[in-house]
Amino acid sequence: MDIENNLQDLKKKFSDVERNLENPTNLSQKEFVSFSKEYSELRPIIEIIDEYNILKEEISDLEEIMKDENSDGDIKELAKEELLEKQKIVLPKVKAKLKLALLPKDEDDSRNAILEIRAGTGGEEAALFAAMLFRMYQKYAERRNWKFEPISISNTGIGGYKEASALINGTEVFARLKFESGVHRVQRVPETESSGRLHTSAATVAILPEVEEVDFEIEEKDLRIDVYRSSGPGGQSVNTTDSAVRVTHLPTGIVVIQQDEKSQHKNKAKALKVLRARLYEIERQKKEMERSTMRKSQIGSGDRSERIRTYNFPQSRITDHRINLTSHRLEQIIKEGELDEFIEALISRNEAERLTGGGNVTF
C-alpha cells in the first residue's frame, strides 16, 4: 500500500463523516452511531496526516532556502541545521507513527473483556496466588475507571480461588489486557510452611473479548443445559431451588458452570456469556495461528500454556519473560494494581513488531 496515494482519500472520507455529523437530525440512530464510531477512529489518523503534511511543507521551504543563491549565509547555515534535524530525526518518527496508524487494527481491541483465572500447580498456595491475581486486576480496573463485575468465584477453605472470572467494562479493556493471558508463576514462602522453604506455584490467566449474541451466535442444538441446586465449600447445599446452571457445548465439550446468582435465569445468561467468549477466543486463536505463519510474535501468542511472568516475593521482583522486563515494585503492582509499566511495554513491543511486519505499507 502506497501511503501517499491513500492520505487524500482518508482526508476526504473524514470530511464526509464530519459533514454528516454536522446535521445529525438527518440521520437515523443507527447511522449516527456508525458515523460517530468512524469519526473517533479516523480523527487520530487525520491528526497524524496533518502533522506529516505540515512537516513536508517545512522541509520543502527549508530546501528552497538552501537552493536560493540570494539567501544570507547565516540563514542558510541555520536552515541546513534545521533541515537535517527534520529529515533525519523528526520525519522518520512521524512516518513511523503514520505507518502504525494505517496498519489494520485488532477488531477486538475496543471490546470489553472477560477475565478468567485458574489455580495451577501448587495446591492451596496456587489457589491463594490465583486470588491475589484476581484482586490485582480488580485494583487495576479501578485505576482505569473500568467496571469490574465478578461473574463466578470458586473459593477454597482458607481464602484461595480454585477458579474466578469477571466481566470488565470500559474503554479499550481488551486492548490493554490481552497480553496478560498465559501462565503466571509465584515464588514465595507460604505462611503455612513451617520450614520456611521457597515454594513455586502457578495460575493461568485468560483474557477473552466479550462478544454479544449478535456478533457470535451459538446454535441451540449444540447446547446441553443442566440445572441443579448450588453448593458451597464442602459440597453443602446453599440454595433450596435449582438455580445453578451447567452449560455444555456439545461440539467442543466446553463446560461452563454458574451458580453465584440466586436466579437460574441470571446464572444461565452469565454462563452463556462466558461460553460465547471462550468459543470466540478459539476462533481468534485459529486466525492468529494463520497470521503467525507470516509473523512470529516475540511477546507470545496468548497461549494459556505459555509461562509469561514470575512474581518473586523474597526479592520483591516481577519479571516478564517475553520482553525481559523486571520490576522491583512487586508490592505496588500486586496490592495497588500498578500494572501499566508492564502493559505499556508489551503494547510498545507489539507495535514495534507490527511495524516491522508491515512491509506492505510503504512511503
UniProtKB/Swiss-Prot annotation:
Chief localization: cytoplasm
Pfam families according to UniProt: PCRF, RF-1
Region of interest (Disordered), residue spans: 286-305
SUPFAM superfamilies tied to this protein: Release factor
Keyword rRNA-binding on entry: no
GO molecular function terms noted in the UniProt entry: translation release factor activity, codon specific
N5-methylglutamine: residues bearing it: Q236
Signal peptide stretch: none
Keywords from the named record: Cytoplasm, Methylation, Protein biosynthesis
Function according to Swiss-Prot or TrEMBL: Peptide chain release factor 1 directs the termination of translation in response to the peptide chain termination codons UAG and UAA.
Family designation: Belongs to the prokaryotic/mitochondrial release factor family.
PANTHER family in the record: LD18447P (PTHR43804:SF7)
Protein's name according to its UniProt entry: Peptide chain release factor 1
Organism of origin: Wolbachia pipientis subsp. Culex pipiens (strain wPip)
Gene assigned in the entry: prfA
